[in-house]
Design a protein with these regions (language model features):
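Intrinsically disordered, low-complexity, positively charged segments
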Residues: 15-23
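The feature encodes a structural signal of leucine-rich repeats
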Residues: 21, 160-161
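A conserved regulatory-domain signal marking ACT and ACT-like small-molecule sensing domains
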Residues: 2-14, 26, 30-32, 37-154, ...
Length: 272
């Protein structure tokens, strides 16, 4: 699941404060006092953090196994026998099938993720999803440590030192990838025309594509997610930067699209 949000970036003594709302914190199980691993690429305005020390050799697996005696133990034993470190795992039974997820570190190991997949299939299981951090090697060299804290009001924030690259104050877009417990923070400089767009879509094929097409005519989209609660069924949130035209023009285009039932725009940190 991908969960997105927005935060103000405030300068504090010794560094920067990036607030984390309840939606992001809930997706990643964050709490005050927790230490997170993090890293950024030189010249980049993005910081990646995680509850686990991810690196380019970490892989995520979702595995389905037949519910036979010892099937779950066999999968776990497979990782252990190869000397692969399981950073996180979980499983549950669904009818006569076991659904299990693993995040495993293959760093400095002779075995590869492909080897594990082949052997899992030999055990009678099948891998339905596999996201490999090798696809994003620069995003997952998490060697620094940062801390989650809480202010006087109990609101959580990530405390960053002054020398973290890309931070200039202003605002940040937060993108939580719950499957691998990772949070990507894109920093935007003060004055950037950041927008928060909310849209209620008609439940017909192509509605989300239409919304994306309309917004993309004027906005560089950074993050999109659906509001996953009953009161907001069909509501989508988009965070992006206005590139051309006015907000009034954007709203007019959305109102002309039958696929879009409601469309709202809020400026973040600037006025038109």
């Amino acid at each position: 699941m991908i969960v997105c949000g927005h935060s103000k970036v405030e300068r504090v003594e010794g560094g920067w404060r990036v607030y984390i709302d309840e939606k992001i914190a809930g997706a990643l199980n964050l709490f005050p006092g927790q230490n997170l691993f993090g890293g950024s690429t030189v010249g980049s305005s993005r910081l990646s953090v995680s509850t686990m020390q991810l690196n380019p050799h970490v892989s995520y697996f979702r595995v389905f196994m037949e519910d036979i005696m010892g099937s779950l133990a066999s999968v776990t034993e497979l990782f252990s026998s190869k000397g692969v470190n399981i950073l996180s795992s979980g499983a549950f039974g669904l009818g006569n099938i076991w659904v299990s997820e693993y995040i495993a570190d293959f760093k400095d190991k002779d075995v590869t993720a492909d080897d594990i997949v082949n052997e899992l299939e030999g055990l009678g299981g099948f891998v339905t999803s596999r996201e490999i951090t090798e696809f994003f090697p620069q995003a997952f060299e998490l060697e620094s440590t940062y801390q989650i804290k809480a202010d006087d009001k109990g609101e959580m924030y990530l405390l960053l030192p002054e020398n973290v690259g890309g931070v200039t104050g202003g605002h940040a877009i937060l993108k939580a990838w719950a499957d691998i417990q990772a949070l990507f923070i894109d920093f935007l400089s003060p004055g950037t025309k950041l927008l928060e767009i909310s849209a209620m879509l008609n439940d017909i094929p192509g509605a989300l594509n239409k919304l994306s097409s309309v917004v993309a005519t004027q906005v560089n989209m950074h993050a999109v997610d659906a509001q996953h609660h009953e009161e907001a069924t069909g509501l989508w949130m988009i965070y992006g930067v206005l590139q051309i035209g006015s907000i009034e023009e954007l709203v007019s285009k959305a109102e002309d699209a039958p696929e879009i039932l409601k469309f709202g725009v809020r400026t973040l940190g600037w006025t038109e």
